[in-house]
Regions:
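Helix-turn-helix DNA-binding segment
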Residues: 1-40
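Basic, Lys/Arg-enriched C-terminal extension of HTH/homeodomain DNA-binding domains
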Residues: 4, 50-75
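Hydrophobic residues on short alpha-helical segments
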Residues: 18-22, 49, 61
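Small/flexible residues
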Residues: 41-42, 59
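Residues within the DNA-recognition helix of helix-turn-helix
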Residues: 44-47
Length: 75
Protein backbone atom coordinates (compact mmCIF):
# COMPACT_ATOMS: atom_id res chain seq x y z
CA UNK A 1 0.00 0.00 0.00
CA UNK A 2 2.75 2.48 0.92
CA UNK A 3 4.51 1.81 -2.37
CA UNK A 4 1.44 3.02 -4.25
CA UNK A 5 1.30 6.20 -2.18
CA UNK A 6 5.03 6.90 -2.38
CA UNK A 7 4.81 6.56 -6.16
CA UNK A 8 2.88 9.85 -5.98
CA UNK A 9 6.13 11.55 -4.94
CA UNK A 10 5.51 11.27 -1.21
CA UNK A 11 8.01 10.11 1.37
CA UNK A 12 7.26 6.88 3.19
CA UNK A 13 6.20 8.85 6.29
CA UNK A 14 3.94 11.10 4.22
CA UNK A 15 2.41 7.97 2.71
CA UNK A 16 1.71 6.66 6.21
CA UNK A 17 0.15 9.96 7.24
CA UNK A 18 -1.96 10.09 4.07
CA UNK A 19 -3.24 6.57 4.69
CA UNK A 20 -4.47 7.67 8.13
CA UNK A 21 -5.91 10.92 6.74
CA UNK A 22 -7.84 8.81 4.22
CA UNK A 23 -9.24 6.79 7.14
CA UNK A 24 -10.60 9.99 8.66
CA UNK A 25 -8.08 10.49 11.45
CA UNK A 26 -7.12 13.95 12.67
CA UNK A 27 -3.61 15.23 13.33
CA UNK A 28 -3.73 14.43 17.04
CA UNK A 29 -4.93 10.87 16.46
CA UNK A 30 -2.36 10.28 13.73
CA UNK A 31 0.34 11.63 16.03
CA UNK A 32 -0.63 9.18 18.76
CA UNK A 33 -0.68 6.29 16.28
CA UNK A 34 2.68 7.17 14.73
CA UNK A 35 4.35 8.47 17.88
CA UNK A 36 4.74 12.03 16.62
CA UNK A 37 3.57 15.44 17.76
CA UNK A 38 0.43 16.85 16.12
CA UNK A 39 2.46 19.79 14.76
CA UNK A 40 4.78 17.36 12.98
CA UNK A 41 1.77 15.62 11.46
CA UNK A 42 0.40 19.01 10.40
CA UNK A 43 3.65 19.72 8.53
CA UNK A 44 3.48 16.32 6.84
CA UNK A 45 -0.10 17.09 5.76
CA UNK A 46 1.01 20.48 4.39
CA UNK A 47 3.72 18.75 2.34
CA UNK A 48 1.24 16.12 1.12
CA UNK A 49 -1.24 18.77 -0.04
CA UNK A 50 1.52 20.66 -1.82
CA UNK A 51 2.96 17.57 -3.54
CA UNK A 52 -0.48 16.39 -4.65
CA UNK A 53 -1.45 19.93 -5.70
CA UNK A 54 -4.70 19.86 -3.72
CA UNK A 55 -6.17 22.30 -1.23
CA UNK A 56 -7.60 20.05 1.47
CA UNK A 57 -7.41 16.71 3.23
CA UNK A 58 -10.55 15.43 1.51
CA UNK A 59 -9.03 15.88 -1.94
CA UNK A 60 -5.82 14.19 -0.78
CA UNK A 61 -7.83 11.28 0.63
CA UNK A 62 -9.71 10.95 -2.67
CA UNK A 63 -6.40 10.63 -4.51
CA UNK A 64 -5.23 8.04 -1.98
CA UNK A 65 -8.40 5.98 -2.47
CA UNK A 66 -8.12 6.24 -6.26
CA UNK A 67 -4.49 5.15 -6.18
CA UNK A 68 -4.67 2.50 -3.48
CA UNK A 69 -7.66 0.18 -3.55
CA UNK A 70 -6.38 -1.56 -0.39
CA UNK A 71 -7.57 1.44 1.61
CA UNK A 72 -11.14 0.44 0.80
CA UNK A 73 -10.57 -2.88 2.57
CA UNK A 74 -10.00 -0.99 5.83
CA UNK A 75 -13.64 0.06 6.04
Amino acid sequence: MLEQLTSLGLTEREGEVLSWVARGKGNYEIGVILGAKPRTICKHVEHILSKLNVENRTAAAAIAFARCSQLLDLF
